Amino acid sequence: MSTVEGKKQEKRRALLDAAYELFLERGASKTSVEEITSRAKVGKGTFYLYFADKGAVTQALLARVSYQLLDDAVTACEHTAGLDSFPDKMIFVIDHIIEALRKDTLLLRFLERSFVWPGLDQIEASGEAEPLMRKLFHTILASPEMAGRTEREIYQRITSLGSMCMSVCYSSILEGKPDNIDAMKPVLYDIIRKAFG
């Protein structure tokens, strides 16, 4: 990477880091572009070189945070013995994400119900895909539970279940509705097993 490219990446990262800190402290709606650029120590014009508006930086952060949560969960899954079926692996990953969000309710408030399954709908089994997503895609396609399903059906099922889990996670952890998260986990995991059975 050239020095110029490296500096561009540093500025973009500084903007994302500043926005993330401010969003956690104050909330996205109460944070201005000026506050983000001030914290990042860059000019306001620099912000608009990288992001069209505050919504674009929010989407980039949602993708970054979701990716990190997913990467951590997948790595933990790979290092855990006894997870033989795809539903077991899916439940492990979802549980890992739920526990991370239970420990960090500020992060959960930021994500709200907007977990982003990074590029799952655009993944191809080729070497072009991002490594984490390529690995996930191969695992999903190789599982017997997915036999006979199209890539679109797999995507729809996984994102629907993931969205449902995030919504229940948010409501259960922050609001105690419809029940606390420990009471809701068996319900969620039963739905996941049935969806892939």
Regions found by a protein language model. Name each.
Residues 55-57, 106:
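A secondary-structure capping/hinge motif
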Residues 88, 100-120, 170-174:
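Amphipathic alpha-helical segments used for helix-helix packing
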Residues 51, 58-68, 72:
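Alpha-helical DNA-contacting segments of helix-turn-helix folds
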Residues 1-26, 30-39, 56:
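Basic, helix-initiating cap at the start of DNA-binding domains
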Residues 71-74, 100, 119-146, 152-159, ...:
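Amphipathic alpha-helical packing segments from all-alpha helical-bundle domains
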Residues 109-112, 144-191:
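Hydrophobic/aromatic-rich alpha-helical bundle segments in the mid-to-C-terminal region
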Residues 41-51:
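Short hydrophobic/aromatic patch on the recognition helix
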Residues 60, 74-103, 161:
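Hydrophobic alpha-helical connector segments
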